[in-house]
Amino acid sequence: KKDNLYQVNFLDYLAMNYFQGCSLLLDKWIKDLVLKHYSTDVEHDYLINSIAASYNSMYFYNKPLFQYRLHEKNSIGAQYDTQTKEEHLQRANTLKIRTQNAHNALNVLNIIRLANSDYYQENQEEFSHMSTFFNQHIQALENKKFFELLCQNTSPYYSLIKTKKARVMDLLYVLKEKVIR
């Protein structure tokens, strides 16, 4: 709802950067944590928001605060406007793209382990299960394991890193790779 303030849950934010930092307000203690645990493995705005969310301190204010123009539609990510559907599908159908969210999630879990040890300790068993799943997911894609990927759809962790459409794309990626061989 417009003009509402929403708290962002850490798990909702785990695998991808929903909130770019073009308009971001943060407390000094978050800034200090981010600087202490800065890593080029995770984009800076993603890092800031992940750490804040792990402390239940990430909020989204659903109100445009200024115009951020990369092009006439006032949106970020202009490269997608210039891609054809075929170019987008070809780009999305690479191992790097198919495994990107799982790698992101593993990097964020590791950073949170260091930056918010209390949160990590409270959720250590869950973090361990997630890490295992994300690593198995990467391996299934790397090794073109169709049935492993299919079975992964029963895991609640898959929906943390992939939409249903992306899961279908994973299966198509593996099938395509098997057919080409």
Regions found by a protein language model. Name each.
Residues 2-81:
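Conserved nucleotide-sugar donor-binding catalytic segment
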Residues 41-42, 69-181:
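C-terminal subregions of glycosyltransferases and related glycan-biosynthesis enzymes
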